[in-house]
Design a protein with these regions (language model features):
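Beta-rich, blade/repeat-based domains predominating
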Residues: 1, 31-48, 76-90, 139-141
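Conserved beta-strand positions in repeat-built beta-propeller and related beta-rich domains
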Residues: 1-7, 49-54, 93-100
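Short, solvent-exposed loop/turn segments at conserved positions within beta-propeller repeat blades
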Residues: 6-9, 54-55, 103-111
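Loop/turn-rich, solvent-exposed surfaces of beta-rich toroidal or solenoidal domains
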Residues: 9-14, 22-26, 30-67
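Short loop/turn segments immediately following beta-strands, especially the blade-tip
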Residues: 14-22, 119-125
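Beta-propeller fold detector
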Residues: 22-31, 70-73, 127-137
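Flexible "stalk/tail and boundary" regions
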Residues: 60-70, 86-87, 92
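Blade-level signature of beta-propeller repeat domains, shared across WD40, Kelch, NHL, RCC1
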Residues: 83-141
């Protein structure tokens, strides 16, 4: 299991027990270079991580060992997340942001905030489904 910690520019790796939900053995898989903030990510069928990198105008595919496999440049500075979709899971969807950009930066990046879609030769894995819990019956909140 992976976890992105954006401000310190790290992606962590954990052992995950699917039966119990327990995580253990946290390690830092990689740290991005200065100015490249890993944000939302996904994993493909070969176990490679696709990391949208805030302020870096790119999505990076990392090997399971944390080595850069390739870089997908984008025409916007703030990609936020990558996910595979379509029935064959061979389309890469990348969300981006424009909120908080100064007007001149927004003008320089007219595609900021758009969804980018790329057909790939790589197969993704389906993101796990989420089932919300009924918080009205909990002691939280």
């Amino acid at each position: 299991m992976y976890h992105t910690d954006t401000p310190p520019r790290r992606i962590h790796c954990y052992d995950f027990d699917a039966a119990s939900g327990a995580i253990s053995n946290q390690t830092v898989l990689l740290r991005t270079e200065r100015g490249c903030f890993p944000d939302g990510s996904t994993v493909d069928a070969k176990g490679y991580i696709w990391s949208a990198q805030w302020a870096a105008s790119r999505v990076v595919r990392y090997s399971p060992e944390g080595e850069i496999d390739f870089i997908l440049p984008l025409p916007v500075s703030h990609p936020t997340c990558a996910a595979f979709g379509r029935p064959d899971l061979n389309m890469l969807f990348i969300t981006t942001a424009y909120q908080g950009m100064m007007p001149e930066a927004r003008e320089a990046e007219p595609e900021a905030g758009n969804l980018f879609i790329f057909q790939t030769d790589i197969t993704g894995i389906a993101d796990p489904l989420f089932r919300p819990i009924d918080l009205s019956r909990s002691r939280i909140g």
